[in-house]
């Protein structure tokens, strides 16, 4: 007799038998994608992740604030998931690409504006039912390094002071670059790690059009052709470097992308290192040159040639003059095996709305196939 466990029971097993986190980012602009690309928080599986991070909040008049007209409604949708899974933690992420580094810089470099921000956070999170804050400053520079550390220390102190009997202390996490140059210039890793509950390491976006050649944006290991600074552009180096800088293994959460990076080939040459003319064509739903959601990649794979970069343990696919490097169930399982060997805190997914959340694109009628593959791999003894 075999025991078939429903998804929720598997999650309970995952959460009780191991301390692995599965941290899933949800983006509030995914609601605006057309047709089957549109994703609202009520489409998320309450039993899939241990933590869901809602991206992104804004800062107005130096105070934490909403960024979309209907954020409050979406906050409610997301936090309703906790009625079905009381162990689920939700965090609100502030910052992101469009927020910009300069605005963060101005706010945190001034003690008065920083204090206003810090004191605004807990009431906002409590009002809307969140369990914590995630800082997505992309990215602090050399002049911001000490201010970023101070911000984190002050937020942690405020959360400690704010907690009431019968309530849990608010969580504090940060999304941190895995790029060596950015890490060196903007982060005092050993210091911030002391005060953060966990660190979401962005081990992706390592390769882009600036290289003028094809290459995978989230390879597990260094490639044969990677010399000079390119040798730093892989998951293994990013994780190892963070650990050497003082990040404790039990706070480091390794990022796994549910998106691919695409390029337009310059010639018939289509292997790793082939010349390119620029970004790949935009996806039907995400509409951003050079980036495809996993569900768009599943469409792309029909009629495409699929290859595996064996040493780097990731796939890429070509069709016509289009080249896309991405992750699939096999590669994410290898990444989970790697992070478990390193005794890391768990995996982070950017983003659940880029996975096949409807289960209608990638076959087998499986919802969130990549995130589920990660969850299953984390649960394996």
From Swiss-Prot:
Gene Ontology CC, one term: endoplasmic reticulum
Keywords, in A-Z order: Antimicrobial, Apoptosis, Cytoplasm, Disulfide bond, Endoplasmic reticulum, Glycoprotein, Inflammatory response, Lectin, Secreted, Signal
Signal peptide (UniProt feature, chain positions): 1-19
Record's keyword annotation contains Oxidoreductase: no
SUPFAM superfamilies in the cross-refs: (Trans)glycosidases, Chitinase insertion domain
Keyword Cell membrane carried by entry: no
Family: Belongs to the glycosyl hydrolase 18 family.
Function: Carbohydrate-binding lectin with a preference for chitin. Has no chitinase activity. May play a role in tissue remodeling and in the capacity of cells to respond to and cope with changes in their environment. Plays a role in T-helper cell type 2 (Th2) inflammatory response and IL-13-induced inflammation, regulating allergen sensitization, inflammatory cell apoptosis, dendritic cell accumulation and M2 macrophage differentiation. Facilitates invasion of pathogenic enteric bacteria into colonic mucosa and lymphoid organs.
Protein name per Swiss-Prot or TrEMBL: Chitinase-3-like protein 1
Organism listed in the record: Rattus norvegicus (Rat)
Gene, per the UniProt record: Chi3l1
């Amino acid at each position: 007799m075999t025991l078939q466990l429903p998804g929720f029971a598997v999650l309970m097993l995952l959460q009780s038998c191991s301390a692995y986190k599965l941290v899933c980012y949800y983006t509030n602009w995914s609601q605006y994608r057309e047709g089957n690309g549109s994703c609202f928080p009520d489409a998320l599986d309450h039993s899939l992740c241990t933590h869901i991070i809602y991206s992104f909040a804004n800062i107005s008049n130096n105070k934490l604030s909403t960024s979309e007209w209907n954020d409050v409604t979406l906050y409610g949708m997301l936090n309703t998931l906790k009625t079905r899974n009381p162990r689920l933690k939700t965090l609100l992420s502030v910052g992101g690409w469009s927020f910009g580094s300069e605005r963060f810089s101005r706010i945190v470099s001034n003690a008065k504006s920083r204090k206003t921000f810090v004191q605004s956070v807990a009431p906002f999170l409590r009002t809307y039912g969140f369990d914590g804050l995630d800082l997505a400053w992309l990215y602090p520079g050399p002049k911001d390094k000490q201010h970023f550390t101070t911000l984190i220390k002050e937020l942690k102190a405020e959360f400690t002071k704010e907690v009431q009997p019968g309530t849990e202390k608010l969580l504090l996490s940060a999304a941190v670059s895995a790029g060596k140059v950015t890490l060196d210039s903007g982060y005092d890793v050993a210091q911030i790690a002391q005060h953060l509950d966990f660190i979401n390491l962005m081990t992706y976006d390592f390769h882009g059009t600036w290289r003028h050649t094809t290459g995978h944006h989230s390879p597990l290991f260094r490639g044969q052709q990677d010399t000079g600074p390119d040798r730093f552009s892989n998951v293994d180096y990013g994780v190892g470097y963070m650990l050497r800088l003082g990040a404790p293994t039990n706070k480091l959460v390794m990022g796994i992308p549910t998106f691919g990076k695409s390029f337009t080939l310059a010639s018939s040459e289509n292997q790793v290192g082939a010349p390119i003319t620029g970004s790949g064509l935009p996806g039907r739903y995400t509409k951003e040159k050079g980036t495809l959601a996993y569900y768009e990649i599943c469409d792309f794979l029909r009629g495409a040639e699929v290859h595996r970069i064996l040493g780097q343990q990731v796939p890429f696919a070509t069709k016509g003059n289009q080249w896309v490097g991405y992750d699939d169930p096999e590669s994410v399982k290898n990444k989970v095996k790697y992070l478990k060997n390193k005794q890391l805190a768990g995996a982070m997914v950017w983003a659940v709305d880029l996975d096949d959340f409807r289960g209608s694109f990638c076959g087998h009628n499986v919802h969130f196939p990549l995130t589920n593959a990660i969850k299953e791999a984390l649960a394996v003894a």
